[in-house]
């Protein structure tokens, strides 16, 4: 679900030309966790380049029960061409975006919170027995 409703999800208000500044105000009517992304065309290319994130709208009065731990998890998908082979025979670490793979929604990599092993090896979600946890 998107954070903003209406034509283009607020794109007309939030789209700025190079060198231009815009300010938009939105009344957040529905509490919840939402995805936001830029609205510049072509949207799949911008999303593939990381122009998205999460927006948490708390209920009025913050009437959610208190918890010991709270975690936010965002899935990312990366659509790229096969890596080129460098002169030394190793695969390049730089890959090129694949528009066809993006249109087909066939990711070559799926990551959480922006990187491989982000929620396991590098930054595991931790809690103690008996903790109340919100994910």
Tell what function each PLM region has.
Residues 1-57, 107-109:
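Histidine- and aromatic-enriched segments that form or immediately flank copper-ligand environments
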Residues 15, 27, 44, 62, ...:
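Residues embedded in well-ordered secondary-structure elements
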């Amino acid at each position: 679900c998107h954070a903003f409703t209406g034509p283009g999800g607020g794109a007309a208000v939030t789209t700025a030309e190079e060198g231009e500044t815009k300010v938009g105000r939105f009344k957040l009517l529905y509490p919840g966790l939402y995805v936001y992304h830029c609205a510049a065309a072509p949207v799949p290319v911008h999303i593939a380049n990381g122009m998205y994130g999460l927006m948490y709208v708390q209920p009025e009065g913050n009437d959610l029960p208190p918890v010991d731990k709270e975690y936010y998890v965002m899935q990312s998908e990366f659509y790229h061409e096969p890596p080129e082979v460098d002169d030394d025979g190793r695969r390049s670490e730089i890959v090129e975006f694949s528009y066809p793979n993006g249109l087909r929604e066939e990711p070559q990599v799926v990551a959480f919170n922006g990187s491989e092993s982000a929620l396991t090896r590098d930054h595991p979600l931790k809690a103690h027995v008996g903790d109340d946890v919100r994910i």
